Amino acid sequence: MNQPELISIIVPVYKVEKYLDKCVESIVEQTYKNLEIILVDDGSPDNCPAMCDEWAQKDSRIKVIHKENGGLSSARNAGLDACKGDYIGFVDSDDWIEPDMYEYLLNIGMKNNADVSRCEFVIEAENSDITVDSQNDSELRVLSGDELIIELVNGDYNEGIMCNKLYKRRLFDSVRFKEGITIEDCLANYYIYKQQVTLVSSSAVKYHYLQRGDSITGTAFSEKSFDILKVHGEIMNSSADNPKIFEHCLKTYIRYNIIYLRTCIAYEKKFYRDDMRNEVKKYSSAILHSPICDKKLKFRVSLITYMFPLYKLMVNVKCHGRDVIRKIIR
């Protein structure tokens, strides 16, 4: 295909010297050649800054930004401020992509007059030998408007990742990544989709997502685990002017509150537990009267609102089993 459109690919780099070469090589070797590759060194303390500079010397399409450490969102925002492309893509620096990913995404986007094009991704464990069928004769779906936002909030948070997508640049004119949170992709996609965009989605697997043991998503329960509640709370509040979308946002927000409430009961984190219980109680009437909420969710909301001691007991028995039963018998 002709390649007049410039695609800017933003790659935040931090403590990934083991993986960086494989990542950048997969971008440099794309079949679509009209690329601007922006490596954002986010104050990495290892050999990554020098590796980025070496890559820039090898390929004139590569630009390097060196900055103080500010986190993933800060690095992506620095790339957005510097990029000049007609389209924008994101690749995490420990991941890699299929050789034709960006040519494929641009092609299906143009054919379907879409603002965003999306492919599937596969989660890879370190040292795995998974072979992926990345054929292009895959199922395509076109989504837009309310339907797109509802799909985003109803899926798990991986629905909202940025790295398996190609965006028209103008979508970021008023959107930046929120700093200081770990679920920044979902929130940024929400504000992009709120611009009434059209998205074409393909079932072709073009992106390889490395699941590292020390990655943010690979770590155990922590304070940052609650970021998903902040993100879905903000999305819910922002959608209050659209009853159809708000109902789905509320359902997802309460569902996550219950998931983390259960975890807090098991870990005996009373402060957070009370906050989440209060959120469930606050919206209990809306959930119990909602036509889109299933009986299981309504039952849990009822227990938390009206019979919380029983709910705590049920959670503890499920999590700690015989130890809880012994205490009751005593």
Model region roles, listed by residue range:
Residues 197, 205-212, 218-245, 256-288:
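Catalytic core of nucleotide-sugar-dependent glycosyltransferases
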Residues 1-230:
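Nucleotide-sugar donor-binding/catalytic module of glycosyltransferases
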Residues 186, 246-255:
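Alpha-helical scaffolds flanking conserved acidic
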Residues 267-330:
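Membrane-interface aromatic/basic loop that binds lipid-linked glycans or pyrophosphate carriers
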Residues 144, 235-239, 302:
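Histidine- and aromatic-rich ligand-binding microenvironments
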